[in-house]
Design a protein with these regions (language model features):
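Conserved ATP-dependent adenylate/AMP-binding module captured primarily in the ANL superfamily
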Residues: 97-129, 202-219, 250-264, 321-323
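Short beta-strand->loop structural element characteristic of the AMP-binding/adenylate-forming
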Residues: 69-71, 78, 82, 86-117, ...
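N-lobe entry segment of adenylate-forming
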Residues: 1-41, 45-60, 145, 167-170, ...
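Conserved AMP-binding/adenylate-forming core of the ANL superfamily
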Residues: 30-61, 66-75, 100-105, 191-198
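Conserved AMP-binding/adenylation subdomain of ANL enzymes
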Residues: 200-217, 224-302, 306-315, 351
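Conserved adenylate-forming
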Residues: 60-62, 166-174, 179-221, 228, ...
């Protein structure tokens, strides 16, 4: 097990990346499943790629006080480009691409990005509608975008092809690392800014509270589109130096979780609710003898012999189906699960660690181009 990381005096997220590359450069930092194969990058390779991306982003005009907008599903390139933007002293705004188009378009316009990172035609359409044709865009996969080579478009692979040396690290602890946008309950724009210092403090507390080490395997099955993901997954990954693993796509995330066997899962109410519903569909109907066996095994009756038998006959196979058989740190980000689902996981032996959103959202003025989504009045 690696020794705890000693933070640099001027700590920032990319500074911690460089520290990990220096102390455990050959260790796996990131995995991504592509075309059915898990591909790995070491900490040293990650630091080199982030440095080259920083040079490329500087060439696109990104710098201190400016903003990269990430509008992608879970992708390793998003994590690397975020760190590259931080390297330059810029901040990253992350939005969930699954939001309704009307709400998403307004948030994109409100973010006023210098550069936008997108993944496919749907994101391209909503970005162009919100920002116009001249807005600089980075495409994760140019093969999916015939127009990626336009005057305002760059492919991710193009950014890595340059030979420019990495610029000097410009990030400082007090700078904003991530900024999040949302529409409030009454239709007003709200923002939340997280500095490098805050994220490293929160991430350090998470590492200590859960005893996280470089031996963890974490699954990043959601985009970094929430403050909870940045606080409880992104920052701890850099600080503890464990491996961050990305599924091939959202459709394969459950199968990829079973293959990977993560020790750390940072999921939301929707994540764990989906898993509970999936297993419920596989169980025998109530009243069937096999269902009675399942219920008995989950009850923990029969003393130590009964609990051991129930584990091997029922709980272990169910945990294997869920891909949680090796999970020591199941984190629940945001709102809690319904009581029945929380109790069901507890009976399986999965003790969810609830981490609610305690950060404060602040009202902000939306630019004229940021159309608010329609919101009904309280009395409607």
């Amino acid at each position: 097990m690696a020794k705890p990381l000693t933070l640099p005096s001027a700590a920032s997220l990319p500074a911690v990346l460089l520290e990990q590359a220096a102390r455990q450069g050959r260790r796996v930092a990131l995995r991504h499943k592509r075309l059915g194969v898990w591909r790995e990058r070491s900490w040293a390779e990650l630091a080199d790629e982030v440095g080259r991306l920083a040079a490329a982003l500087a060439g696109l005009g990104l710098g201190p006080g400016q903003r990269l907008l990430a509008l992608t599903p879970p992708r390793p390139q998003t994590a690397l480009l975020s760190l590259a933007a931080h390297w330059l002293g810029a901040e990253v705004a992350a939005l969930d691409p699954a939001l309704p188009a009307e709400a998403l378009s307004g948030l994109i316009a409100a973010a006023q990005p210098t550069v936008t990172l997108i993944d496919g035609p749907a994101q391209r359409a909503v970005t162009l509608a919100a920002l116009g044709e001249a807005a600089p865009v980075i495409y994760l996969d140019a093969r999916r975008e015939p127009q990626a080579g336009g005057p305002a478009g760059r492919a991710y692979a193009e950014l890595l092809a340059g030979q420019a040396l990495p610029p000097a690290l410009a990030a400082t602890p007090e700078q904003t690392a991530f900024r999040f946008f949302r529409w409030g309950e009454h239709g007003g724009l709200e923002t939340q800014a997280l500095s490098h210092a805050f994220l490293l403090q929160e991430g350090g507390e998470r590492v200590r509270a859960h005893g996280l080490s470089a031996d963890e395997r974490a699954l990043a099955a959601r985009a970094f589109a929430t403050a909870e993901q940045a606080r409880h997954l992104f920052a701890p990954w850099l600080l503890a130096g464990f491996s961050l693993n990305f599924p091939e796509n959202l459709a394969t995330r459950d199968q990829d979780r079973r293959e990977l066997g993560p020790t750390l899962v940072a999921g939301t109410r929707e994540t764990y609710g989906r898993l509970a519903d999936d297993v419920a569909r596989r169980l025998p109907p109530p009243g069937h003898w096999q269902r009675r066996l399942v219920d008995w095994a989950l009850s923990g009756q029969g003393g130590a012999p009964g609990r051991a038998l129930g584990y091997w006959l029922v709980r272990r196979p169910l945990l294997d189906v869920l891909g949680l058989i090796h999970t020591r740190h199941p984190l629940l980000l945001g709102p809690p699960l319904p009581a029945a689902q929380a109790e069901w996981f507890a009976r399986l032996g999965v003790r969810l660690h609830a981490l609610p959103d305690v950060a404060r959202w602040q009202e902000a003025s939306a630019p004229a181009t940021a159309a608010r989504p329609f919101v009904t009045s309280a009395g409607a």
